[in-house]
């Protein structure tokens, strides 16, 4: 009895020391005890199953450990009990003690837990039944591309948190690392079939309040679905380690009523049409430089760095680069292989340099090429017009 008392005393002291160290840090942290508020059927089912499992596990834990602790105290050697020699079930009671727990575990695993989990998984994978629209999500280092095939809308979404906040040069905002320049807009109450793929490495599209976390894998088209039940803005991020700026790939979804969604579609189409029309316009140097700076900061600075110094050997410097300041066209006016413009349009095989011809408009490519050739100490002085890019695609 004295040994048991000493053990309990030491355990209590150890637990007190651990709690004294941990509780202050928990008090200062934004700590969540449960899942975020679900806003889709998948998230709600997941939460309900989680709570159901926790109840079953808690009952099992209390029952099993209660019996164990009672047996250890009740049948201890100090009160005269002798150890039994157990060679296997021999009597009816011993057979019951062996078979009843086995039957209980089967019931718990296959009925209490298995049936609800089975139906939830089947529902999660039913992406096509009664789907109202399709959203295609393409992951790339380190941004997302969203496409609405039914509406002819396609655009990039990149993190908009200022780099000065990341470098601790200014105070961090409310949605630090969870804000983007172009959010996803979806209608409330509509089942959206989500198709996912990637252009480079594996990414994971994850929005906690949707209960959705699905890998985007190069060469594969994977599926999931969401049906948002409440208007609002929902934030997530890439949940798969995908390289240098993995932590800078947020996902922001704005759920709106259907009428507001249709108005957004019309507005987005108008903006995209205006951007396409920019290919036939002659841009001034100031216009190209201003637009190019914006494109560079969103699409290029993450690898080539804000001042064009790069991060060798993976991300070459643009400042003083012979490729950036070299010729773009041959004497016949054709695009030179491996030139600055060719690399931006078609990428560089075997490197992290991806092709931008399918993600940036003619005007954006012309602007960023002009900006890079006339910044970071590069003084090429020439201008690239969107019409030139259009003709060389």
How should these model regions be labeled?
Residues 1-29:
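N-terminal secretory/membrane targeting signals
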Residues 29-52, 72-294:
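Non-transmembrane, membrane-proximal soluble domains of secreted or membrane proteins
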Residues 269-289, 293, 297-298, 354-393:
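Flexible coil segments in periplasmic/lumen-exposed cytochrome c-class electron-transfer proteins
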Residues 203, 249-252, 316, 351, ...:
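Extracytoplasmic/periplasmic beta-strand context in beta-sandwich domains
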Residues 194, 238-239, 292-306, 344, ...:
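The canonical Cys-X-X-Cys-His
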Residues 285-311, 319-346:
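Sequence/structural segment immediately N-terminal to covalent heme-attachment motifs in c-type
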Residues 49-75:
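Alpha-helical transmembrane segments
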